[in-house]
Amino acid sequence: MNVGGDLVIRDACHADKTAMPFANVGGNVDLRGASLADIDLSGASVAGELRIDGQKLAACPKSSGDPDVLNLRNARVGTLLVADDALTAPRRLRLDGFAFARVGGFEGETKSQLRGRSIEWWDRWARLDPDYSPTSYAQFAAAFTNSGHRDAASDIRYLSRERERETACKESWLRGSCLLQTALGSVAGYGIGSHTFVVLRWVLVFWLAGAALLWLTVPAARHKGAIWCFCASLAQLLPVIPINKELTEFFNDPERTRLKGWQVFLFSALGVVGLALGAILLLAVSGLTHSS
Protein backbone atom coordinates (compact mmCIF):
# COMPACT_ATOMS: atom_id res chain seq x y z
CA MET A 1 0.00 0.00 0.00
CA ASN A 2 1.31 3.45 -0.96
CA VAL A 3 -0.06 6.68 0.51
CA GLY A 4 1.41 9.95 -0.68
CA GLY A 5 0.06 12.05 2.21
CA ASP A 6 -1.26 11.34 5.71
CA LEU A 7 -2.92 8.09 6.76
CA VAL A 8 -5.54 8.98 9.37
CA ILE A 9 -7.14 6.05 11.20
CA ARG A 10 -8.18 8.20 14.14
CA ASP A 11 -11.19 6.98 16.19
CA ALA A 12 -11.57 3.96 13.90
CA CYS A 13 -13.11 0.69 15.11
CA HIS A 14 -12.19 -2.73 13.76
CA ALA A 15 -12.48 -5.99 15.68
CA ASP A 16 -10.49 -8.10 13.22
CA LYS A 17 -6.96 -7.89 11.90
CA THR A 18 -5.97 -4.80 9.93
CA ALA A 19 -3.11 -5.78 7.63
CA MET A 20 -0.90 -3.05 6.19
CA PRO A 21 2.53 -4.69 6.03
CA PHE A 22 5.21 -2.83 4.08
CA ALA A 23 2.96 0.20 3.70
CA ASN A 24 4.72 3.28 2.34
CA VAL A 25 3.30 6.51 3.80
CA GLY A 26 4.70 9.84 2.66
CA GLY A 27 3.11 11.79 5.53
CA ASN A 28 1.92 10.90 9.03
CA VAL A 29 0.08 7.89 10.45
CA ASP A 30 -2.45 8.88 13.12
CA LEU A 31 -3.73 6.02 15.29
CA ARG A 32 -5.04 8.16 18.16
CA GLY A 33 -8.34 6.97 19.56
CA ALA A 34 -8.44 3.98 17.23
CA SER A 35 -9.80 0.68 18.55
CA LEU A 36 -7.99 -1.82 16.36
CA ALA A 37 -7.78 -5.36 17.69
CA ASP A 38 -4.73 -6.28 15.61
CA ILE A 39 -3.04 -3.83 13.26
CA ASP A 40 -0.04 -5.00 11.27
CA LEU A 41 2.40 -2.27 10.21
CA SER A 42 5.39 -4.59 10.00
CA GLY A 43 7.98 -3.39 7.52
CA ALA A 44 6.10 -0.14 6.97
CA SER A 45 7.86 3.11 6.11
CA VAL A 46 6.42 6.37 7.48
CA ALA A 47 8.17 9.55 6.42
CA GLY A 48 6.45 11.70 9.03
CA GLU A 49 4.99 10.98 12.45
CA LEU A 50 3.51 7.84 13.98
CA ARG A 51 0.97 9.03 16.56
CA ILE A 52 -0.17 6.66 19.30
CA ASP A 53 -2.27 7.15 22.43
CA GLY A 54 -4.27 5.09 24.90
CA GLN A 55 -7.77 6.28 24.02
CA LYS A 56 -10.28 3.68 22.83
CA LEU A 57 -13.85 3.80 21.57
CA ALA A 58 -16.03 2.51 24.39
CA ALA A 59 -18.72 1.24 22.01
CA CYS A 60 -16.32 -0.64 19.76
CA PRO A 61 -17.04 -4.41 19.93
CA LYS A 62 -14.21 -6.90 20.33
CA SER A 63 -14.15 -10.53 19.30
CA SER A 64 -12.07 -11.44 22.37
CA GLY A 65 -10.85 -9.99 25.63
CA ASP A 66 -7.22 -10.00 24.54
CA PRO A 67 -5.27 -6.72 24.47
CA ASP A 68 -5.00 -4.88 21.16
CA VAL A 69 -1.86 -5.64 19.17
CA LEU A 70 0.21 -3.06 17.28
CA ASN A 71 2.81 -4.79 15.13
CA LEU A 72 5.72 -2.47 14.28
CA ARG A 73 8.34 -5.10 13.52
CA ASN A 74 10.96 -3.75 11.12
CA ALA A 75 8.90 -0.60 10.57
CA ARG A 76 10.66 2.75 10.12
CA VAL A 77 9.16 6.11 11.06
CA GLY A 78 10.51 9.63 11.08
CA THR A 79 9.11 10.68 14.47
CA LEU A 80 7.52 8.57 17.20
CA LEU A 81 4.80 10.42 19.10
CA VAL A 82 3.38 8.61 22.12
CA ALA A 83 0.72 10.24 24.31
CA ASP A 84 0.96 10.27 28.09
CA ASP A 85 -1.99 7.87 28.42
CA ALA A 86 -0.44 5.23 26.15
CA LEU A 87 0.31 3.00 29.14
CA THR A 88 -3.28 2.96 30.41
CA ALA A 89 -4.91 1.02 27.57
CA PRO A 90 -4.46 -2.77 27.35
CA ARG A 91 -2.13 -3.16 24.36
CA ARG A 92 0.67 -5.37 23.16
CA LEU A 93 3.43 -4.10 20.92
CA ARG A 94 5.75 -5.90 18.52
CA LEU A 95 8.92 -3.81 18.37
CA ASP A 96 11.62 -6.11 17.01
CA GLY A 97 13.52 -4.10 14.39
CA PHE A 98 11.36 -0.98 14.89
CA ALA A 99 13.37 2.16 14.04
CA PHE A 100 12.64 5.87 14.47
CA ALA A 101 14.74 8.99 14.07
CA ARG A 102 13.13 11.28 16.66
CA VAL A 103 10.79 11.31 19.64
CA GLY A 104 8.60 14.39 20.09
CA GLY A 105 5.23 15.82 21.08
CA PHE A 106 1.89 16.14 19.34
CA GLU A 107 1.22 19.13 17.12
CA GLY A 108 1.36 22.39 19.08
CA GLU A 109 3.14 20.72 21.98
CA THR A 110 6.50 22.31 22.66
CA LYS A 111 7.69 20.19 25.57
CA SER A 112 9.85 17.34 24.40
CA GLN A 113 8.58 13.92 25.39
CA LEU A 114 12.13 12.86 26.04
CA ARG A 115 12.64 15.57 28.66
CA GLY A 116 9.14 15.41 30.09
CA ARG A 117 9.07 11.71 30.93
CA SER A 118 11.18 9.50 33.10
CA ILE A 119 13.42 6.81 31.68
CA GLU A 120 11.27 4.27 33.51
CA TRP A 121 8.21 5.47 31.56
CA TRP A 122 9.86 4.62 28.26
CA ASP A 123 11.02 1.30 29.70
CA ARG A 124 7.43 0.44 30.63
CA TRP A 125 6.29 1.41 27.14
CA ALA A 126 8.95 -0.83 25.55
CA ARG A 127 7.82 -3.63 27.88
CA LEU A 128 4.42 -3.60 26.19
CA ASP A 129 6.26 -5.93 23.84
CA PRO A 130 6.53 -9.10 25.97
CA ASP A 131 9.47 -10.29 23.87
CA TYR A 132 12.64 -8.38 24.67
CA SER A 133 14.25 -6.65 21.71
CA PRO A 134 17.32 -4.44 22.17
CA THR A 135 16.45 -2.44 19.06
CA SER A 136 13.85 -0.19 20.67
CA TYR A 137 16.14 0.60 23.60
CA ALA A 138 18.99 1.38 21.22
CA GLN A 139 16.70 3.73 19.29
CA PHE A 140 15.72 5.57 22.46
CA ALA A 141 19.37 5.81 23.51
CA ALA A 142 20.26 7.33 20.13
CA ALA A 143 17.38 9.81 20.43
CA PHE A 144 18.52 10.87 23.90
CA THR A 145 22.11 11.22 22.71
CA ASN A 146 21.11 13.30 19.70
CA SER A 147 19.10 15.61 21.98
CA GLY A 148 22.09 16.10 24.28
CA HIS A 149 20.85 13.90 27.15
CA ARG A 150 23.80 11.54 27.45
CA ASP A 151 23.03 10.52 31.04
CA ALA A 152 19.50 9.56 30.01
CA ALA A 153 20.94 7.59 27.09
CA SER A 154 23.14 5.68 29.54
CA ASP A 155 20.13 5.02 31.77
CA ILE A 156 18.06 3.54 28.94
CA ARG A 157 20.99 1.36 27.86
CA TYR A 158 21.28 0.17 31.47
CA LEU A 159 17.57 -0.73 31.54
CA SER A 160 18.03 -2.59 28.27
CA ARG A 161 20.76 -4.71 29.84
CA GLU A 162 18.58 -5.27 32.89
CA ARG A 163 15.81 -6.61 30.69
CA GLU A 164 18.33 -8.77 28.84
CA ARG A 165 19.34 -10.21 32.22
CA GLU A 166 15.71 -10.78 33.20
CA THR A 167 15.11 -12.63 29.95
CA ALA A 168 18.14 -14.86 30.47
CA CYS A 169 17.22 -15.61 34.09
CA LYS A 170 13.59 -16.30 33.21
CA GLU A 171 14.73 -19.26 31.13
CA SER A 172 16.90 -20.58 33.95
CA TRP A 173 18.72 -18.75 36.73
CA LEU A 174 21.36 -21.49 36.70
CA ARG A 175 22.42 -20.68 33.15
CA GLY A 176 25.84 -19.13 32.75
CA SER A 177 24.43 -16.12 30.90
CA CYS A 178 22.06 -15.36 33.78
CA LEU A 179 24.79 -15.59 36.42
CA LEU A 180 27.23 -13.56 34.34
CA GLN A 181 24.71 -10.81 33.56
CA THR A 182 23.70 -10.66 37.22
CA ALA A 183 27.32 -10.27 38.29
CA LEU A 184 28.02 -7.61 35.67
CA GLY A 185 24.94 -5.63 36.62
CA SER A 186 25.17 -5.81 40.40
CA VAL A 187 28.94 -5.33 40.63
CA ALA A 188 29.75 -2.93 37.78
CA GLY A 189 26.46 -1.62 36.37
CA TYR A 190 27.28 -3.34 33.06
CA GLY A 191 30.04 -0.77 32.58
CA ILE A 192 27.49 1.80 31.39
CA GLY A 193 28.04 5.45 32.30
CA SER A 194 27.74 6.42 35.94
CA HIS A 195 26.22 3.02 36.76
CA THR A 196 29.78 1.67 36.59
CA PHE A 197 30.62 3.40 39.86
CA VAL A 198 28.48 0.91 41.77
CA VAL A 199 31.71 -1.11 41.95
CA LEU A 200 33.03 1.50 44.40
CA ARG A 201 30.31 0.47 46.84
CA TRP A 202 31.60 -3.09 46.81
CA VAL A 203 35.19 -1.93 47.19
CA LEU A 204 34.19 0.24 50.16
CA VAL A 205 32.28 -2.59 51.86
CA PHE A 206 35.12 -5.12 51.60
CA TRP A 207 37.74 -2.48 52.41
CA LEU A 208 35.99 -1.51 55.65
CA ALA A 209 35.33 -5.16 56.51
CA GLY A 210 39.02 -5.99 56.10
CA ALA A 211 40.10 -2.98 58.17
CA ALA A 212 37.64 -3.89 60.94
CA LEU A 213 38.88 -7.47 60.94
CA LEU A 214 42.47 -6.29 61.32
CA TRP A 215 41.63 -3.84 64.08
CA LEU A 216 39.43 -6.20 66.09
CA THR A 217 41.20 -9.55 65.73
CA VAL A 218 44.89 -8.92 64.94
CA PRO A 219 46.77 -7.31 67.87
CA ALA A 220 49.89 -6.72 65.77
CA ALA A 221 47.85 -4.72 63.28
CA ARG A 222 45.98 -2.80 65.96
CA HIS A 223 49.28 -1.81 67.50
CA LYS A 224 50.20 -0.05 64.24
CA GLY A 225 47.09 2.13 64.39
CA ALA A 226 43.75 2.55 62.64
CA ILE A 227 45.15 4.31 59.57
CA TRP A 228 47.62 1.49 59.04
CA CYS A 229 44.77 -1.04 59.24
CA PHE A 230 42.82 0.84 56.58
CA CYS A 231 45.85 1.01 54.31
CA ALA A 232 46.71 -2.67 54.82
CA SER A 233 43.14 -3.75 54.08
CA LEU A 234 43.13 -1.72 50.87
CA ALA A 235 46.49 -3.14 49.82
CA GLN A 236 45.22 -6.68 50.31
CA LEU A 237 41.93 -5.97 48.52
CA LEU A 238 43.69 -4.43 45.51
CA PRO A 239 46.78 -6.63 45.10
CA VAL A 240 47.37 -5.49 41.51
CA ILE A 241 47.89 -1.91 42.72
CA PRO A 242 51.17 -1.74 44.67
CA ILE A 243 50.72 0.56 47.66
CA ASN A 244 53.46 -0.35 50.12
CA LYS A 245 55.57 -3.50 50.36
CA GLU A 246 55.39 -3.46 54.16
CA LEU A 247 51.60 -3.67 54.00
CA THR A 248 51.51 -6.69 51.71
CA GLU A 249 54.33 -8.48 53.56
CA PHE A 250 52.33 -8.28 56.78
CA PHE A 251 49.94 -10.91 55.43
CA ASN A 252 52.80 -13.23 54.47
CA ASP A 253 53.09 -15.02 57.81
CA PRO A 254 54.00 -18.69 57.31
CA GLU A 255 55.13 -19.00 60.94
CA ARG A 256 51.76 -17.72 62.20
CA THR A 257 53.41 -15.18 64.49
CA ARG A 258 50.91 -12.44 63.60
CA LEU A 259 47.96 -14.19 62.01
CA LYS A 260 45.98 -17.30 62.86
CA GLY A 261 45.03 -19.83 60.24
CA TRP A 262 41.46 -18.61 59.83
CA GLN A 263 42.68 -15.04 59.53
CA VAL A 264 45.12 -16.01 56.78
CA PHE A 265 42.24 -17.68 54.96
CA LEU A 266 39.97 -14.63 55.25
CA PHE A 267 42.60 -12.16 54.12
CA SER A 268 43.55 -14.43 51.22
CA ALA A 269 39.87 -14.52 50.29
CA LEU A 270 39.84 -10.72 50.47
CA GLY A 271 42.56 -10.63 47.82
CA VAL A 272 40.59 -13.04 45.63
CA VAL A 273 37.50 -10.84 46.00
CA GLY A 274 39.53 -7.85 44.84
CA LEU A 275 40.73 -9.73 41.77
CA ALA A 276 37.16 -10.86 41.03
CA LEU A 277 35.84 -7.29 41.29
CA GLY A 278 38.55 -6.11 38.92
CA ALA A 279 37.83 -8.90 36.43
CA ILE A 280 34.08 -8.22 36.45
CA LEU A 281 34.70 -4.50 35.99
CA LEU A 282 37.03 -5.18 33.07
CA LEU A 283 34.47 -7.47 31.42
CA ALA A 284 31.72 -4.91 31.91
CA VAL A 285 33.54 -1.91 30.46
CA SER A 286 34.99 -3.94 27.58
CA GLY A 287 31.50 -4.87 26.35
CA LEU A 288 32.67 -8.36 25.39
CA THR A 289 29.65 -9.96 27.06
CA HIS A 290 27.07 -7.71 25.39
CA SER A 291 25.39 -9.82 22.76
CA SER A 292 23.32 -6.95 21.38
Regions found by a protein language model. Name each.
Residues 281-292:
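Juxtamembrane boundary at the C-terminal end of a transmembrane helix
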Residues 1-183:
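N-terminal leader/targeting and pre-domain segments
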Residues 43, 74, 204-237:
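Outer-pore turret/helix-boundary of cation channels
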Residues 161, 217-218, 290:
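Hydrophobic/aromatic-lined pockets within catalytic cores
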Residues 49, 194-198:
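Juxtamembrane interface helix immediately N-terminal to a transmembrane segment
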Residues 153, 213, 285:
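Hydrophobic, well-ordered secondary-structure elements that form the walls
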Residues 199-211, 272-276, 280:
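Alpha-helical transmembrane spans of integral membrane proteins, capturing the lipid-embedded, hydrophobic core
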Residues 177-195, 219-280:
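Pore-loop/selectivity-filter region of tetrameric P-loop cation channels
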